[in-house]
Amino acid sequence: MNKGNNNLCNNRQILLSRRDALKGLSAGFGYMAFAGLASQAAVNSPLAPRRPHFVPKAKRVIFCCMRGGPSHVDTFDHKPALVRDEGKELPKFRNRELMPSPWEFKRHGQSGLQVSELFPNLAQHADDLCLLNGMYSSVPAHPQSFLQLHTGSFQFVRPSMGSWVLYGLGSENQNLPGFISLCPPDNVGGAQNYGSAFLPAFYQGTKIGNFNQNIKAASLRNLGNQNMSGKLQRRQLDFVQSLNRDLLDRKKQSSQIEGVIESYELAFRMQSAVPELMDANDENESTLKQYGINNRATENFGRQCLMARRFAEAGVRFIEITHGNWDQHRNLNAALTRNCAATDKPLAALMKDLKAVSYTHLTLPTKA
């Protein structure tokens, strides 16, 4: 043995006993074990990302829901026959005459998509739009049609489309809900529009705010406890979850209890993630102006579009935003003009932002 090794062996102060080594490294072993368990828990989570049967063309959805339904013949569905038949009576209705749209349509982009003058900003993205004119409902009434749009049925309780997307693809961010509904209406189907029905409860949407309030004032209620430290909250949650798991063991299997357990854990993780994403103060003035947040007419929906973009970037799988009221039976000119002006600029800004960060091919912005 060389001299250097002899010196090393004789210097007992720099050597650790087996007991000291285990004592000093216990935290490291514990962390390694925790990391392994945590990664396995993430893999086993029902909300973990999953590979679909086919390669998807989009990874997430932003559903822009226009409550009441925009008049298709005045926005994106040009009907030249209405101009030709102006003034003619309808066969099944007396004293009812056909009327063409009072707004001019023009072709835009290389696709030549015809868009009404009511959407001048959105028309600039004509080549990124896909128009589906095949939508219809089984019942000519708003509540049933609204529910059928979201779930596929107005008669039976069915999972919402956001729940199906989350069920099929999982969530990309385990600290955020995979399905978020911003300011949804409480009527016309209510919670069924973002519910999971017979799917496990953790696939239902997380509601933030309601239809009658500005998104700026919306928040997730009871998300945190200002009177309790994070460490103490964790201990309290562990105790509550132990009771929940005992109940689950007795029930053998219950998607509702499993959903409660998962939602409690998610809520604890969301305490820092959600407020940060809903705070637009870190956006520059140019972005806020682009979304119309500096204008009273576009401020509310502009914020929703901006929140949708931020949630999408953070990995939320399905985001629904809502604007209304589009049910213009009377006062069409003023009411439809007002609604289009409130949504045109924010929607165009959302499309522009998604395209700028190469998210257009990954995100499916849907307007209905």
Please describe what each predicted stretch is.
Residues 2-362:
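Ligand-binding pockets and gating/stacking loops
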Residues 363-368:
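A short, hydrophobic C-terminal helix/tail in secreted or cell-surface proteins
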